[in-house]
Amino acid sequence: MTNETIASQLAHRTIRAYKDQPLTEAEVTTLMDVARHTATSSFLQSCTILHITDPKVREAIGAASGQPYVGGTKGDLFIFVADLYRNSRIRAEQGVSSEALSSINLFLTALEDALLAAQNVVVAAESMGLGTVYLGSILADPRPVVKALELPELTFPVVGLLVGHADQDPGQKPRMPLSVVTAKNTYPRVESYTETLADYDREVTEYYDLRSGSRLESFTHLVATNIGVGGAHVSPIMEVLHEQGLCLR
């Protein structure tokens, strides 16, 4: 069973190279309107999206991320912010304490709002024939990002997103089989993931082998060696959350 929307989602690829062709004002407005109509936890609408058009701000974000293409001029850059500040102001203006907004529970609702909005924008952008790439790398060094965006207390940059006209045609990265990532009712127990994923490991190795790089590895090897070594894995995220007045209880 398929339709145009499903076909677009199943064809998702990460695009890191873009043409020097900014989105039109109408395209940006459409994508932001899609984000605005995304489902939101408890109708609190705890997300703000920043469209980065200032070259200096973008360069600062690019430097913090460690990804050269983030700080350039190609593709439009959006930052999805978990935003409890706006609701704290609304409460203050009505004489209500905002202490509850510093809880991890409320941060998780804002985090969900931001991520759902980002994914809705990706689906919409790809349906328009545009390319996208998520930028979790903005959290490799979150303090400069918070500073560059002039984020107030009770806000946090959750994820970045580049959207634009693709200047590359990469292959689609294989995913684990449905039998591994889905189950009915209760969590599945697997005796050996290494054995279960053997065919998938070969598929991933072949994918990297066919690319124009020297990287050769399987999925299970990636999991065994890559977690905890990249910038985003050792970033002081919890410290910055606390500095922003978030997740204090």
Predicted regions located by residue number:
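Acidic, surface-exposed loops and disordered segments
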Residues: M1-R249
